[in-house]
UniProtKB/Swiss-Prot annotation:
Family stated for the protein in its record: Belongs to the prokaryotic/mitochondrial release factor family.
Keyword match Membrane: no
One Pfam family hit: PCRF
Function, in words: Peptide chain release factor 1 directs the termination of translation in response to the peptide chain termination codons UAG and UAA.
Taxonomic source organism: Pseudomonas putida (strain GB-1)
GO molecular-function term, one example from the UniProt record: translation release factor activity, codon specific
SUPFAM superfamilies: Release factor (SSF75620)
Top-level taxonomic group: Bacteria
Name of the featured protein: Peptide chain release factor 1
Annotated Gene3D superfamilies: 3.30.160.20, 3.30.70.1660, 6.10.140.1950
Keywords: Cytoplasm, Methylation, Protein biosynthesis
Main location per the UniProt record: cytoplasm
InterPro entries assigned to the protein according to its UniProt record, in alphabetical order: PCRF, Pep_chain_release_fac_I, Pep_chain_release_fac_I_sf, Prokaryotic/Mito_RF, RF-1
Length: 360
């Protein structure tokens, strides 16, 4: 194992022993905030510590077996050869496991997200495709046991959505959806096309992690213009009676967010403010992420909204993710919520890229 990795593991081992002592300290136990923080860190560090302890044990076994290779007893030497082989195999497996455990964790992976889908080029067909993408993500969310709520929607004239915004809540939502941001292209024959020609349309998807109270950007109320209006669409007759929908404009940036799905103006405002905070956070981090992606030539993860990331070709039943040259002939399954078939290879490629950087 490389000296740099061993050094990291030695530091982590010291921290594990320190955390063990802290969690047994009466002063820490009486302070629930510190106790919870140390408990979370302990839960993260303990599996790595256990794997490193096992690696050290196997490394010791290997050194012992290698010493026996010089023994005058041929039977012992033969046994030692097999033990050396087994120990080396175990060490390779453990080293690979430890490398993955040491990969830097994205602090946003566990967060809920705001999912934004907008029709791009292609008019009515792009709006219809926005609806197809929204159904794909809705079914995927259902499969994973996530909760999805629509915050704002602008329906297309012939179906689908010119724009639809949803909040997705659950376990590891951003960790799974973070590479969905970008331009999604569809190639198919529209129902209105009489000559059977294939048309190309596009939609943009943005996945924004929802910040918690500590991470949320402080927003000056003087920078906001808040408008109320009557909601339309979902909500039954009630929406025609009260101005419950909220539109918030952040004057310095021109960002506009609106929420109309709740009957309570207070709830709509809270959702809109959380979404605005997520968009402002995204503005701050995207420039830095793009710089890192450019420097390291990441195959995935730049998150550029204008970057064409995926094509859905209906005549061929094909889905191609252009970032990793992945092509799957299972369009129907993917659009029915089986997008995990694309997400997992993207995550694997990103992890491989991180491993390469870790070893540099």
């Amino acid at each position: 194992m490389k000296a740099s990795l061993l050094n990291k593991l030695d530091i982590l081992q010291d921290r594990f022993e320190e955390l063990t002592a802290l969690l047994g300290d009466a002063e820490v136990i009486s302070d629930q905030t510190r106790f919870r923080a140390y408990s979370r860190e302990y839960a993260e560090v303990e599996p790595v510590y256990a794997a490193y302890k096992e690696w050290c044990k196997v490394q010791g076994d290997l050194e012992g077996a290698q010493a026996l290779l010089k023994d005058s007893d041929p039977d012992l030497r033969e046994m030692a050869v097999e033990e050396v082989r087994e120990a080396k195999e175990q060490l390779l497996t453990l080293e690979s496991q430890l490398q993955r455990m040491l990969l830097p964790k994205d602090p946003n992976d566990g967060r809920n997200v705001f999912l934004e889908i907008r029709a791009g080029t292609g008019g009515d067909e792009a709006a219809i495709f926005s609806g197809d993408l929204f159904r794909m993500y809705s079914r995927y969310a259902e499969k994973r046991g996530w909760r999805l709520e629509i915050l704002s929607e602008n329906e297309g004239e012939h179906g689908g959505y010119k724009e639809i915004i949803a909040r997705v809540e659950g376990e590891n939502v951003y960790g799974k959806l973070k590479f969905e941001s970008g331009a999604h292209r569809v190639q198919r024959v529209p129902e209105t096309e009489s000559q059977g020609r294939v048309h190309t349309s596009a939609c943009t998807v943005a996945v924004l992690p929802e910040p918690d109270e500590q991470a949320a950007i402080e927003i000056n109320p003087a920078d906001l213009r808040v408008d109320t209006y009557r909601a339309s669409g979902a909500g039954g007759q009630h929406v025609n009676k009260t101005d419950s929908a909220i539109r918030i404009t952040h004057l310095p940036t021109g960002i506009v967010v609106e929420c109309q799905e709740e009957r309570s103006q207070h709830k709509n405002r809270a959702r809109a403010m959380s979404w605005l905070s997520a968009k402002l956070n995204d503005m701050q981090t995207s420039a830095a992420q793009n710089a890192i992606a450019s420097e390291r030539k990441l195959l995935v993860g730049s998150g550029d909204r204008s970057e064409r990331i995926r094509t859905y070709n209906y005549p061929q039943g094909r889905v191609t993710d252009h970032r990793i040259n992945l092509t799957l002939y299972s369009l129907d399954d993917i659009l029915s919520g089986g997008v995990e078939a694309v997400i997992e290879p993207l995550l694997a490629e990103y992890q491989a890229d991180q491993l390469a950087a870790l070893g540099d």
